[in-house]
Amino acid sequence: MASPGTRPGASPGTERGSARESSGLQSSGSAGLFAVEAVELVGPAASAALDGVECPDALREALAGLLLVVEAERAWDMRAAGVDAAVVLGAAGAGAAEALDAAEAAGVLRLTGGRVRVLDPGPAHTVYATVPPARGRAAHRLLAAAHTGGPQALPVLFHRASAATAPAPRLGDALAAAAALPGGGPTHAERSAAWARSAELAVDEGLRAVRLIHAADQARLAGLPHRARELLAQAGCEGPHDAVRGSAQLVSGQLALQDGPVADAREALLLAAESLASTDPHRALAARLAAVEASWAMGDAAACREALDLTPARPEPDRRLAAYRAGMSAVMHGRLDTGRQPLREVVAGAGAAGILDSPEVLLRAGGAALVVGDLPAACRANSRALAVARARGPNILIAQALERLAYGELRAGRHARARAHAEDGLRTALGAGQDNLAAHHHAILALVASVEGSSEAVAEHAAAAERVAAPHGLAQAATLAQWARARADLAGGRLAEAAARLGPLVGAGPRRGHFAVRMLAVPCFVEAATGTGQAEAARSATAEFAHWAAQGADPQAPAQLARCRALLSGPEEREALFTTALARHDEVTGDFERGRTQLLYGAWLRRRRRPGEARGRLRDALVSFERGGALGWAAQARAELRATGDAGPCEPDGPLAVLTPQQLRIARCVAEGATNREVALRLSVSPRTVDHHLRNVFAALGVRSRVELSRWVDRAEKTTAHP
């Protein structure tokens, strides 16, 4: 059987043989130089670093040399998935292939797909750190020679620069020029390493600072925020030059936007825009747009308006960008009707240009589509942004594109897709040090879990979002997390808890939720408030919701508004309003929201003693919830069906079969720990009715306490689930 690093059908060593051939070791000339110099690269100190590595004594020196060369190559990009086998084997010289065999056997390295991957970074790092500086520089010289003639000049220049022993301004200039070249090829991590090394070779302090700022920005784009901050600190950007100071402030603000307090990010970005306005209007505009993003995340509408309304030093050459700023400014000033047309131009422009647009342009189009309520266009633009970021970079935008896409799918009612993209985005954000985006992904996952019925997942993801949202001032993530908790309460019939969570978010005052989210939570609040005797608060929230819904900001809003009005109306009007709500649901997609309306309508019909009609609505609700994976809500629909006398497939057998449907509902609520008053609120009956039924439950089952009832129900339900 072939080893893990070999091609199917190839014998062990074939892959290494091809690597040696491609590195030129089979020819004369430079191969001899590599072999002689590589033997001299390491000494006793470096070999001692291998004490914990199982390796034949005859190969220890060669293995140390190989690890030194591998680590020197990794200095070029520590995030890369391995290093080029042909390059490192060629640089390591004689004995390298046998040393690689030993390293694989010891679990230190692995050769696969023409790349040498580091499995245990400790030995290689220790060797690189303990060899004398001259030997480290020699390793870089060998790597520069091995890269010569390759497709890129940057690695050759980087290793030559790393082998330099004194300030070498010309070499530093060449390295910086290569790092600045646009287009594909070097990764952001590689460009960062090149800029940082070119800074070390600079004589002028101002030039050194500029290059370190470039290195920091490339480290940020590579998903290395800690390295980026180290480089910024080395730059020491308190000099008199606006351009240098503004560049440092821009990178600092963008870093804080990724994983720091967003209020700090906003201030740094506004300072950057001011400093760069006269010398670099393009980057000044980027700073202003990032300040808008920070203000949005912190839920500060006034700060959004301020950043949007800043007058650029020069007219914006991009018409779509000007339309975006004009449209968003109108929206933030409360004029969605005015802002809709320019924002639609932004969306249409992205659709026309398609895949040729940058991820940033597509993300703006996706955001504009969300604001005007065009959810299909939002999902298309954000999906395209994700594809472009993955294909062409920058990789730092992948987690953001996934977050925007997941949120759009959540709004569109495609919860399974939203979960898949948010899970991917969470992994990506955490891997890139983007804690703020990770918090948003956690909040989205909490909302999805509140639909799918996992209260544990809701609590876990909401808590994770809030742990970052609180210190970093992420009002949007915090509002989404609180909404998810409240919706889980609703799914579990805990109306009072849901109303208590949502009341501050949808109302006025300092605890008001994020301006772009709070209206979305109003239908949940109205459902909870009307079920707990808070009709006036529900009416006030519904009046504001009606004004918002009339602007067309969300396709589900008309149906939700009719549902809210039905819950607040008298018996004469309620049926007509529920019917109107269902008609509005028919005009848009979204099984979950339609199912909620059917559930509330069916429950009301049951309480009006119209069980036959109620069953039809409740069965429709059950189908909608099951189709959308809303398991907790499906359980509510089944419970309501049982209360109508419907003998569904989930009817209990065994001891609980002696209970009536209403007694069974009360027994289950009590088993969950609900008080009589809480049960009454859930089932829309009086506490006296609950008390009456509960006495009969105790008598029928022969139990004498609520604790005993809870154990009885738990055993019976487990027996039914697992016969």
Indicate residue ranges for each PLM-predicted region:
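Extended alpha-helical scaffolding segments used for macromolecular assembly and cargo binding
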Residues: 117-118, 134-227, 231, 245-247, ...
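Helix-turn-helix DNA-binding segment
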Residues: 642, 649-723
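Short secondary-structure boundary elements
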Residues: 1-8, 12, 16, 25, ...
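Alpha-helical repeat scaffolds
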Residues: 174-178, 226-235, 263-272, 301-315, ...
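Internal alpha-solenoid helical repeat scaffolds
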Residues: 2, 189-192, 200-440, 448, ...
